[in-house]
């Protein structure tokens, strides 16, 4: 349970937010008066709603503060001298102090957890839209993903585009694409589309469209993705024809040579996955094809690597049971961890990049993908790393340290200027 000081601090913080929110309302009102269209009207309404919600939160906190003051006056004689709260089953006070009361009313334990997204419902919803709005939303959630999430955290947002509309009784109305932007406390429904689920689904549905427009997430562009993707067809064919050290050297049915190659191992993996594919995933693949999507059927597809251009946080469900695809995504997630480790070891890494060393893209990808129903084959990831790991690392975007002579010249100028305007010691560049 929060103390009175904590409640007072929270009230002060919200009052500061309220001042900003009211100023934004005034700005929106001026904009609406200047140009009274639907967009400005909606912006004004949204900002008024934000200001009203902050005001209601302040009112609620003030009620809590008043209740706490009243309790303090009346409960002195009722308080147990041992310090144990009424209702606590302990006979003696715990060494721990009493903390917050967690409200569970908003939780629904019958709802599935985030690991069990209803991919069929999500894909049916997404394929009901035209491709332009889907790809523009993907751009907003990848290239501009951080800013979009920051601006809309804790809200359910709508994407609109002139290409997306529906006819209602002969009237053309905009058809909005809804995406939820959760915060840490949000509980998502199985069919609710989050940025992670959106990227995962769309990357699996439209890899050829993403390739044609060269839409690569910044997260992927810095780990050598384009270097591996530019000659993908010849690269994957060469890899499939390379000797496979994980299979015994014996004649393989269908192999061009007497010795096993990676193609034989992938074919064997495909056979194992085919027997594991549940009906739900078969249904969503069939629906996607019926909707006109060109899906990846095998890893040597020209656009197979582009499934991961948008940095999905797990293997897309439309290619989960295609041999080698889930492992290809895991390979890229390891590259992200490798780059973060390198950046954390350099002086030029930003504070955010140094912090990211503590996270693990690979472990997250592994957990999310396996929760969808398959175990990754680590040997395929090893094969990818042996074949392409060094080339990918050589193409990492790591930033550069400043040239020592340039740094020295800049520091001299800083020192001179600081001495002119201050008696403080100059800071180091």
Curated annotation (Swiss-Prot):
Annotated coiled-coil segments of the chain: 4-71
Superkingdom as given in the UniProt entry: Viruses
UniProt keywords, alphabetically: Capsid protein, Chaperone, Coiled coil, Endonuclease, Helical capsid protein, Host cytoplasm, Host Golgi apparatus, Hydrolase, Nuclease, Ribonucleoprotein, RNA-binding, Viral nucleoprotein, Virion
Region (Interaction with host UBE2I/UBC9): 188-191
Region Homomultimerization, residue ranges: 1-79, 100-125, 373-421
Region of interest (Viral RNA-binding), ranges: 175-217
Interaction with glycoprotein N: region residues: 80-248
InterPro entries noted in UniProt: Hanta_nucleocap
GO cellular component, one term: host cell perinuclear region of cytoplasm
Positions of the UniProt region annotated as Viral panhandle binding: 1-175
Summary of the function given for this chain in its UniProt record: Encapsidates the genome protecting it from nucleases. The encapsidated genomic RNA is termed the nucleocapsid (NC) and serves as template for transcription and replication. The nucleocapsid has a left-handed helical structure. As a trimer, specifically binds and acts as a chaperone to unwind the panhandle structure formed by the viral RNA (vRNA) termini. Involved in the transcription and replication initiation of vRNA by mediating primer annealing. Plays a role in cap snatching by sequestering capped RNAs in P bodies for use by the viral RdRp during transcription initiation.
The protein, known as: Nucleoprotein
Organism name: Seoul virus (strain SR-11) (Sapporo rat virus)
Annotated gene: N
């Amino acid at each position: 349970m929060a103390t009175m000081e904590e409640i007072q601090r929270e009230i002060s913080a919200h009052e500061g937010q309220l001042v900003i929110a009211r100023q934004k309302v005034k700005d929106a009102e001026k904009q609406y008066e200047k140009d009274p269209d639907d967009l400005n009207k909606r912006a004004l309404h949204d900002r008024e709603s934000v200001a009203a919600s902050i005001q209601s939160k302040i009112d609620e906190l003030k009620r809590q503060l008043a209740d706490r003051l009243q309790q303090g006056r009346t409960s002195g004689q009722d308080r147990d001298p041992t310090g144990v709260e009424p209702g606590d089953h302990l006979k003696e006070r715990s060494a721990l102090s009493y903390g917050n009361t967690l409200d569970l009313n908003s939780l629904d334990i019958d709802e599935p957890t985030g690991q069990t997204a209803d991919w069929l419902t999500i894909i049916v919803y997404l394929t009901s839209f035209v491709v332009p709005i889907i790809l523009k939303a993907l751009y907003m959630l990848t290239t501009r993903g951080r800013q979009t999430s920051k601006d809309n955290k804790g809200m359910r947002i709508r994407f609109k585009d002139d290409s997306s509309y529906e006819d209602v009784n002969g009237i053309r109305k905009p058809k909005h694409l809804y995406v939820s932007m959760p915060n840490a406390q949000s509980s998502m429904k199985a069919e609710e589309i989050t940025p992670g689920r959106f990227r995962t689904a769309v990357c699996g549905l439209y890899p050829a469209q993403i390739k044609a427009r060269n839409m690569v997430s910044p997260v992927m562009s810095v780990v050598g993705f384009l270097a591996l993707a530019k000659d993908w067809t010849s690269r994957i064919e060469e890899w499939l024809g390379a000797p496979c050290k994980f299979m015994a050297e014996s004649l393989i049915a269908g192999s061009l040579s007497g010795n096993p190659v990676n193609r034989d191992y992938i074919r064997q993996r495909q056979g194992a996955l085919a027997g594991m594919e549940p009906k739900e995933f078969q249904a969503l693949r069939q629906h996607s094809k019926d909707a006109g999507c060109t899906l990846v059927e095998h890893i040597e597809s020209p656009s197979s690597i582009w499934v991961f251009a948008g940095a999905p946080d797990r293997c897309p469900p439309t290619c989960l049971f295609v041999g080698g695809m889930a492992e290809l995504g895991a390979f890229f997630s390891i590259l992200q961890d490798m780059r973060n480790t390198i950046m954390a070891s350099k002086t030029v890494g930003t504070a955010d990049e140094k912090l990211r060393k503590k996270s693990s893209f690979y472990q997250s990808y592994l957990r999310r993908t396996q929760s969808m129903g398959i175990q990754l084959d680590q040997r395929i990831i090893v094969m990818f790393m042996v074949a392409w790991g060094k080339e990918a690392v050589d193409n990492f975007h790591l930033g550069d340290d400043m040239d020592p002579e340039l740094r020295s010249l800049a520091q001299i100028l800083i020192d001179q200027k600081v001495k002119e305007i201050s008696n403080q010691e100059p800071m180091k560049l």
